[in-house]
């Protein structure tokens, strides 16, 4: 019979240590860094309970909570009761308390600031909330745009439902969005007017913010006479570019059903067509957030058509985020990775690419030179030179 080992000193027994009140010694004996272990567990808790943050952000956008605070004036802070008073009358006496808890959560993510003041005769404290620096991107600016629509899109039912099919897609193949809705996201837009409205607003708002920064920083539009915007939508990007460079003749190229709704823009001609078939000729071709929608095979078709449409020394100006080859933990690295997984889940073959992958595509399409020019608000402006 095997002999059961015993300790010559009963106090060495872990259970005895606990019973004798030496639990701290017991923990240190079995865990050399209990503080680090606690921090890791706390981080794990944050991950396990992370869903409320994006959903509270979505609700804050829908209720315009940040806009209400902004309207109060620069550096002003409002209590939840004051914010609730600015909402449409809903008849809910608990609204201030609910808003306080939601805004408290946003304060932990540095979306809003918070100052606790003495509640006076009511006892306790009253928390007042202001806008943290990041909040301005979720409040409509002078152009009427913000990232709020992007939150409404990503947290909307059409996209949220797709995530339920991610496991199935990993095991069996396919695109989660298509599995839920029976079609890809681009065709789905034609069946759901509300989704189409939110999608277009999200793309328009982000594009407006980015292109205005690009025209201030990127000097490659100089000396271009004819610029083709592939996938240009309603032509807003060319409106901004040509207003800054009046000598440019803009060709806004998109699908016919998109172009038919495009407004008249001085200096811009709207042309309907299919980028997989052919692309109008120009001195330069502009593509912002087009390649990330498609697989490498589809991107090569697009880029080869661009190559055919350009003169010698012509260029394609590509604006895309660049994945970093080794994961980092910066806000931008997380944003790009999150977008990449969104593309995997929602888009037919779309993905975010590394700079090396963009260079490989450029060379495979026949371009002689790949030139990353400048970094603008998370996006790279890259030139593919013929």
Curated annotation (Swiss-Prot):
An heterologous biosynthetic pathway of mescaline is reconstructed in Nicotiana benthamiana plants and yeast cells expressing Lophophora williamsii genes TyDC2, CYP76AD131, OMT1 and OMT11, thus providing a sustainable production of phenylethylamine-derivated natural products. Keywords: Alkaloid metabolism, Methyltransferase, S-adenosyl-L-methionine, Transferase. Pathway: Aromatic compound metabolism; Alkaloid biosynthesis. Transmembrane segments: none annotated. PROSITE patterns: SAM_OMT_II (PS51683). It is an enzyme of class 2 (transferase). It comes from the Eukaryota. S-adenosyl-L-methionine binds at residue 254. Its EC number is 2.1.1.-. S-adenosyl-L-homocysteine binds at residues 207, 231, 254, 274, 288. It catalyses: dopamine + S-adenosyl-L-methionine = 4-methoxytyramine + S-adenosyl-L-homocysteine + H(+); 3,4-dihydroxy-5-methoxyphenethylamine + S-adenosyl-L-methionine = 3-hydroxy-4,5-dimethoxyphenethylamine + S-adenosyl-L-homocysteine + H(+); 3-hydroxy-4,5-dimethoxyphenethylamine + S-adenosyl-L-methionine = mescaline + S-adenosyl-L-homocysteine + H(+); 4-hydroxy-3,5-dimethoxyphenethylamine + S-adenosyl-L-methionine = mescaline + S-adenosyl-L-homocysteine + H(+). The keyword Ligase does not apply. The active site is at residue 292. Homodimer. O-methyltransferase participating in the biosynthesis of natural products derived from phenylethylamine, including mescaline, a natural hallucinogen potentially used in psychotherapeutic treatments. Catalyzes the O-methylation of mescaline para hydroxyl groups, using dopamine, 3,4-dihydroxy-5-methoxyphenethylamine, 3-hydroxy-4,5-dimethoxyphenethylamine and 4-hydroxy-3,5-dimethoxyphenethylamine as substrates. Belongs to the class I-like SAM-binding methyltransferase superfamily. Cation-independent O-methyltransferase family. This is O-methyltransferase 11. The gene is OMT11.
């Amino acid at each position: 019979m095997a002999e059961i080992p015993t300790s010559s000193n009963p106090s060495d027994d872990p259970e005895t240590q606990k019973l004798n009140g030496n639990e701290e010694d017991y923990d240190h004996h079995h865990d050399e860094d209990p503080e680090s272990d606690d921090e890791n567990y706390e981080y794990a808790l944050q991950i396990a309970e992370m869903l409320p943050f994006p959903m509270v952000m979505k609700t804050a956008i829908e209720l315009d909570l940040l806009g209400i605070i902004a309207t109060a004036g620069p550096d002003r802070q409002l209590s939840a009761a004051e914010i609730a008073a600015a909402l449409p009358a809903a008849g809910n006496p608990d609204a201030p308390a609910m808003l306080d808890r939601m805004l408290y959560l946003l304060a932990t993510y540095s979306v809003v600031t918070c100052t606790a003041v003495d509640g006076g005769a009511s006892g306790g404290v009253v928390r007042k909330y202001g806008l943290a620096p990041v909040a301005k991107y979720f409040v409509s600016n002078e152009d009427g745009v913000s990232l709020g629509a992007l939150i409404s899109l990503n947290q909307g039912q059409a996209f949220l439902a797709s995530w339920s099919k991610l496991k199935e897609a990993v095991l069996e193949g396919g695109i989660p969005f298509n599995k839920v809705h029976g079609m890809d996201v681009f065709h789905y837009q034609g069946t759901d007017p509300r989704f189409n409205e939110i999608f277009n607003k999200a793309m328009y708002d982000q594009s407006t913010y980015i292109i205005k920064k690009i025209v201030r920083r990127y000097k490659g539009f100089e000396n271009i006479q004819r610029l083709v915007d592939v996938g240009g939508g309603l032509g807003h990007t060319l409106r901004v570019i040509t207003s800054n460079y009046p000598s440019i003749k803009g060709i806004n190229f998109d699908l016919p059903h998109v172009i038919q709704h495009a407004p008249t823009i001085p200096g811009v001609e709207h042309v309907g067509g299919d980028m997989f078939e052919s692309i109008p000729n120009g001195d330069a071709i502009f593509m912002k957030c087009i390649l990330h929608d498609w697989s490498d095979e589809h991107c090569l078709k697009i880029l080869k058509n661009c190559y055919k449409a350009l003169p010698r020394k012509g260029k394609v100006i590509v604006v895309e985020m660049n994945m970093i080859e080794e994961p980092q933990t910066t806000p931008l690295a997380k944003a790009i990775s999150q977008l990449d997984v969104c593309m995997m889940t929602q888009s037919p073959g779309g993905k975010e690419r590394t700079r090396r992958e963009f260079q490989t595509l450029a060379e495979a399409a026949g371009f002689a030179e790949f030139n990353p020019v400048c970094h603008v608000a998370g996006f790279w402006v890259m030139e593919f030179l013929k």
